[in-house]
Amino acid sequence: MRKLILPALLLVGITAGAQRYEDKFTRPLGDVLNDVSKRFNVKLKYNVDTTGLKLAYADFRIRPYSIEETLNNILAPFDFKPVKQNDRYYKIKPYEYPRRQADDGVKLINWLSSLYNDRSSWEARKDSLRREVRQLLGIDQLLPLCAQEAPRYTKIRKFDGYSVQNFCLKTVNGHTVCGSIYAPLSKGKHPLIICPNGHFTNGRYGTVQQQRLGTLARMGAVCVDYDLWGWGESADEVGKEAHQTAEAHVMQALNGIRILDWMIQRKDVDTQRVGVNGGSGGGTQTVLLTVLDDRYTAANPVVSMSSWFDGGCPCESGMPIQLAAGGTCNAELAAMFAPRPMMVVSDGGDWTSTTPEVEFPYLQRIYGFYNAQDKVSNIHLPKERHDFGPNKRNAVYRFFIDTFGLDESKLDESKVTIEPEEALKARP
C-alpha cells in the first residue's frame, strides 16, 4: 500500500507546481517578463501584446549574468525584441527586419570588408550588387512601360533670385508624379540637383524643404522635388495607404529615374553636374538612385545612411534589396558611388550616430581603392538629433558650393518665400 501512496503524493506535488518536463516547463510570457523585470531591476515597456502567449522552457532561458541575453532568449520565439533605452529601461517591440543594433552594424561592415581587398574585387562585388538590386526591386520590368509624354506645367512664379514651377509627369500604368522645379533666374547652364524628400512634416511642402531648394536655386542650381508615393498629390491618385506598401519602394525609385530622364533634356541643365540630395527617407532614396543610375556626379545623403538600419518605411525597405549578393546595407550601397564626390551628414541622435567610427572609415577604404579618399567626407553633428535643421542644411550648401561651384554670396535662407501647400501643387 505504501508503494501506491508515495507516487500519488508525488504526482500531486508536481501538478501543483505547474512546471514539469511533460509541459516543457511552460509559463505565461507576461509572468516571465515580470519576474525578469524584478530580478534584474529593470523597467520594461511593452509595444507588443503578450496576452495568452506562453513560453516553453521559460526559466531555463534566463541568464543570471546578462539581461540582454535573457531578454533575447525569452522574446525571440515570438518575433519580439528588446530595445535598450538605458541601463534600467527596455522597450519590448515587434521584430523589425530593417533595424538592427549598432554592434550588428560593426559585424556586418567587418564581414563586407573581408569580401574585397582591392579595386578589382570591389568592382566585381559592385557589379553583382547592382544587378541583384535591380532584380529584387523589379525596376527593369517597369521602365520600358513608362509613358514618354512631356510633363504638364503650371505657370512660373518668380521670387528673389529664383523661380518655382510645378509639374505633373506621367510614368507607368496611368500613374503620375507631381513636383516642383526651383530654378535660378540667371541664364546659361546650371547644375541639376534631384531632391527626393523624406518623412519630415508636410513632405515636400514643408518649410525646411522649400528653404533648402530655394536657397540652392538662388545660388545657381536647378532643383527638383516630388511627392512620395501616397503623399501629397500622389495620395489623391492612389490613396494614403499606398505609401505603406512595397509598391512605394519601386515607384519612388522609378519616379526618380523618370524625372532625371526628363530634366537632363532641359537647355538650362549642365549634364556634367548632376547631384542628388535628400534627408532621412529621402537620403535612403538618394543612395538607391545612385545605385540605379550612373548619371549622378555628386551625392549627399543626410541623416540616413547606416550599416544597421535600412529604413523603417516600406518605401525604403519594402522590397528586399538588402539581400542582394548575399547581404548588404545602405553603407555598402553608398560606397558604390566611389570615386565620385559624396558627403554624408550624420548626427548623434539616430542610426547615423556610428558614422564617424564605422560607416565613414568603411567608405574611405572603398574610395581608397580609387585613390580618391578626398572625394568622400562626413559632417557629423554629435549633439543633434534626427531632423533637417540649419546645421545640416548648411552642410548641404557647403558641399554643393565646393562640388558644383555654386555662388556662396547668395546663401541666405531669409530670401526664400515659403509658399502655401496649394501653391506647390500641379493639379488645380
What is each residue range found by the language model?
Residues 296-335, 340, 347-360, 369-372:
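Mobile cap/lid helix-loop segments that gate and shape the active-site cleft of serine hydrolases
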